[in-house]
Curated annotation (Swiss-Prot):
Origin: domain of life: Eukaryota
Domain F-box per the UniProt entry, residue ranges: 105-157
Name by which UniProt lists this protein: F-box protein pof7
Keywords noted in UniProt: Cytoplasm, Ubl conjugation pathway
Keyword Cytoplasm listed: yes
Subcellular location: Cytoplasm
Cleavable signal peptide: none
Gene this chain is encoded by: pof7
GO process terms (BP): SCF-dependent proteasomal ubiquitin-dependent protein catabolic process
Subunit organization: Interacts with skp1.
Length: 361
């Protein structure tokens, strides 16, 4: 047993014998966890509680962490040394020699490299359409120079652009896309495909909003400050419909069930624990201009309709304005964007079942 292991085992024995120290360390670990999650008020209370139980809890915790880190480093070094010795043993074994009949003929050229570029482009286009995932482009390009050269062809990106029009990622006709190609993108289909703003259907957009709120206390010198975190969720569908949801629930609990098929998402009396805070999702419609300006319209109540005006910037939706419209008087009321943060797209693989659009990486 090494010196570090001896020290660590002695420290752990001391902790196990001291009940108060063990309790203080548990409070200290909970405080660190709360601080990482952003619950500053809760973490401060747990830090105070830990120091009340045992005044040296911080130094003991740091000493234990340091010893555990040293132990892990020693174990990794031992594993690396064992692996290197095993490699040396394998390399010392003589490899079998090939006979003349078994020798490898390195001059054989794969048949696919003999194909003309036009035929290869047709094959690649059909394969990628069947896979429904353009992320495979980079993997295919890395296989050989022939594929890398073929994937630079502008005609291939033209078919991708037509596919984007068919999948409603651009709410434009093919004719208007071709006109825009000449006016803005120097007749380069590749430039148009890579730079033109598009909507995404294979995931959802998430906005993480935070603000500080003063708390209450019996004494003025010890007034707590709460960090409030809530999330805005937005999911688009190819038929110009969308789901809007605002909640304090984290993405891990919401995203997998964020679908029109989930009826509990739209019911305020839902028994589902992840939607039990009284918030319900709202269905609305979305539209996007050729320049990437997006409008999200959804009814907040029988009296008011909310409108989110956003600008598409890659995987982000930047806020332009947020206002409500009175359904009877058409009076508009601007809402401040103080706490609102940009939506960021997050891909969700389970969304492919009810989204028929071409997936983008």
């Amino acid at each position: 047993m090494s010196t570090v292991e001896d020290q660590l085992s002695l420290e752990l024995e001391t902790v196990n014998k001291d009940i108060l120290l063990k309790k203080a360390l548990l409070h200290y670990k909970d405080a660190i966890k709360s601080e990482r999650e952003g619950n500053l008020g809760e973490s401060l209370n747990k830090y105070r509680l830990a120091h009340k139980v045992h005044e040296d809890v911080e130094s003991i915790y740091r000493r234990l962490e340091r010893l555990q880190l040293c132990k892990r480093n020693e174990e990794e070094e031992m594993l690396n040394s064992d692996a290197s010795e095993a490699m040396l043993t394998v390399s010392s074994v003589p490899s079998p020699t090939l006979t003349e009949n078994e020798s490898v003929n390195e001059s054989v050229v794969p048949n696919i490299l003999k194909l003309p570029d036009e035929v290869l482009l047709v094959i690649l286009e059909n394969c990628i359409r069947d896979l429904h995932d353009l992320r495979y482009l980079s993997s295919i390009a890395l296989t050989c120079k022939h594929f890398a050269k073929a994937l630079r062809a502008d005609s291939l990106y033209r078919s991708f652009c037509y596919c984007s029009c068919e999948q409603k990622e651009w709410q434009q006709s093919i004719k208007s896309i071709e006109e825009e190609l000449v006016e803005k993108y120097q007749q380069s289909w590749k430039t148009l495909f890579l730079k033109k703003p598009r909507s995404r259907f294979d995931g959802c957009y998430i906005s993480v909003c935070r603000y500080f709120r003063p708390g209450t206390s019996d004494t003025s010198w010890n007034q707590p400050i709460h960090l409030i975190t809530y999330y805005r969720y937005l999911r688009l569908y190819p038929n110009s419909t969308c789901i809007v949801y605002q909640s304090s629930n984290e993405p891990n609990d919401v995203v997998r069930n964020f679908s029109v098929q989930n009826t509990s998402l739209f019911s305020p009396m839902s028994s589902s624990p992840m939607f039990s805070n009284g918030n319900v999702a709202l269905t609305g419609s979305w539209s996007m201009t050729p320049s990437g300006e997006m409008l999200i319209v959804y009814p907040a109540s029988q009296t008011y309709t909310y409108v989110q005006k956003l600008q598409v910037r890659g995987i982000r939706l930047k806020w332009i304005s947020f206002y409500s419209i009175h359904n009877y008087t058409s009076f508009t009321n601007e809402m401040p964007l103080t706490h609102n943060r940009d939506y960021v797209f997050s891909r969700v693989y389970s969304y492919t079942a009810d989204s028929e659009s071409l997936k983008r990486g």
